[in-house]
UniProtKB/Swiss-Prot annotation:
The protein's name: Undecaprenyl-diphosphatase
Compartment(s): Cell membrane
PANTHER family, per database record: UNDECAPRENYL-DIPHOSPHATASE (PTHR30622:SF3)
Membrane topology value: Multi-pass membrane protein
Gene that this polypeptide is encoded by: uppP
GO BP terms: cell wall organization; peptidoglycan biosynthetic process; regulation of cell shape; response to antibiotic
Cell wall biogenesis/degradation is among the record's keywords: yes
Length: 274
């Protein structure tokens, strides 16, 4: 059955990683409903490692853009500034992860914590969508280093409060900083490459002996499914944000967070984490 769990985890990860609805919360519920027999350490590591598939989906989706940028980055200042902004934007997450990553993973991944992050994030998303300030940044190369750093700092909210969603925190941070929805969403994808890619690689190196218990082929199966589903989700989200706001996601987050709290209160979901 490990292959079945790997596929389901891959589907859930692929759908939810880049949508602003928290992959963590959905993986917790999915694992509970399936009754996955893996240890907490194995599940935690598996969930992080299959993010690698989602990251590869970003690289595949934007490969033409990246190839074009690679050809001109040596002399094109806007392209240089864009990627310097990505580097600057990821610094807060790197510092926070190095200093407090183990503590956060050990103590803050309880379902009730994730549920409240979903709810609060949904309310905040609604509030930000109701702001009257028009966006002033409509292209990735207009973001600048200051905005990039602050968006990266906003991204850290997902590290400090699991369930808030890295995508949601970075997209909302971008919108507060004046980016329009499509640009904020694209920059969130760019920030996700080093943030999630680094975390997935580090966890794989540190914990591959745990993953061997369920089979490395199952790990790669989960990552492959995550890749395919995430690729489709990226395309859908970009089309969606070009015509719609995030209020539907805000409502969904609140409802899903309340559902998790109900499952915890009824005893259907243990509140000690996965």
């Amino acid at each position: 059955m490990d292959w079945f769990y790997a596929i389901i985890y891959g589907i859930v990860e692929g759908i939810t990683e880049f949508l602003p609805i928290s992959s963590t919360g959905h993986l917790i519920v999915a694992g509970n409903l399936m009754g996955v027999p893996w240890s907490k350490e194995i599940r935690d590591t598996f969930e992080v490692v299959i993010q690698g598939g989602a990251i590869l989906a970003v690289l595949a989706y934007y490969w033409r853009d990246f190839a074009g940028q690679a050809r001109v980055i040596g002399h094109d200042r806007p392209t240089q500034r864009l990627w310097l902004g990505v580097i600057v934007g990821v610094i807060p997450a790197v510092v926070l992860g190095v200093l407090f990553g183990d503590v956060i993973k050990a103590h803050l991944f309880r379902p009730s914590v994730v549920a409240w992050a979903l709810i609060v994030g949904g309310v905040l998303m609604w509030v930000i969508e109701n702001r009257k300030a028009p966006p002033v940044v409509h292209d990735l190369k207009q973001i600048g280093l200051g905005r990039a750093f602050l968006i990266g700092a906003a991204q850290c909210l997902a590290l400090l409060w699991p369930g808030f969603s890295r995508s949601a925190s970075s997209i909302l941070g971008g919108m507060v900083m004046g980016l329009d929805r499509p640009t904020a969403t694209r920059f969130s994808f760019y920030l996700g490459i080093p943030t999630l890619g680094g975390a997935a690689l580090l966890d794989f190196i540190k914990s591959r002996h745990l993953l061997a218990e369920i089979g490395l082929l199952n790990v790669f199966l989960g990552a492959a499914v995550s890749f395919v589903v995430a690729y489709l989700a990226i395309g859908w989200l970009l089309r969606f944000v070009s015509q719609h706001n995030f209020k539907g996601f805000a409502v969904y987050r609140v409802i899903f967070g309340l559902l998790i709290l109900l499952l915890v209160a009824s005893g259907r979901l243990a509140n000690g984490g996965l």
